[in-house]
Regions:
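Short, structured "edge-of-domain" segments at secondary-structure transitions
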Residues: 1-174
Length: 174
């Protein structure tokens, strides 16, 4: 039989979907931007809209920045793991991210060096095994081996990269 295509969201020119997840059971969401900000906001502030609509603004974006991640925060979450394109990362205690309203810039989550950008703000418990994905390889790391530091610090190098290599993402390993 023929399959009907359903439009999930109306996108403006140049927009793309970064993440999608069910919100049932989650109270908070972490939204990260390329310039190193992370907004923790209540799922309740993101009102349901119809399928063929643009939706609501999650995070206010400064010029030349874009959303890199949007992840649910579970009750068991203890930290936000910030990871950059150049492989720097760290854990920051969740309580350092006071929940704010949507359509605000959030908190500076990591200090970026020239040319670096945030790849992900990943809510974690602190005992997970993670996979860092670069343009050339993957590296498994234990969350427990990543240093904890305040929000606006650089963190430490989590993966060795050669020229023209960069981090594209991080996921919790199964």
């Amino acid at each position: 039989g023929s399959r009907r295509k359903l439009k999930a969201i109306k996108l403006k020119e140049g927009d793309s979907i970064v993440s999608a997840f069910p919100t049932n059971g989650y109270k908070l969401v972490a939204i990260g931007t390329s310039l190193g900000n992370c907004l923790v906001t209540s799922v309740k502030t993101i009102n349901p809209t119809g399928r063929n609509t643009i939706g609501v603004l999650g995070i206010k974006l400064p010029k030349n920045s874009y959303v890199v991640s949007a992840r649910p925060i579970m009750e068991s979450t203890q930290y936000i793991l910030s990871l950059t394109r150049q492989g720097y990362g760290k854990l920051t205690k969740l309580e350092e991210y006071v929940p704010q309203n949507r359509n605000t810039v959030g908190h500076k989550t990591i200090a970026l060096s020239n040319g670096d950008s945030l790849v992900s703000c990943l809510p974690v418990e602190g005992n997970e095994e993670l996979t860092i994905i670069s343009t050339h390889n993957q590296l498994k790391v234990r969350c427990a081996d990543i240093s904890t530091s305040a929000r606006n610090t650089r963190g430490s190098s989590l993966i060795s990269l050669r020229a023209n290599q960069y981090v594209v993402g991080i996921e919790v390993s199964n």
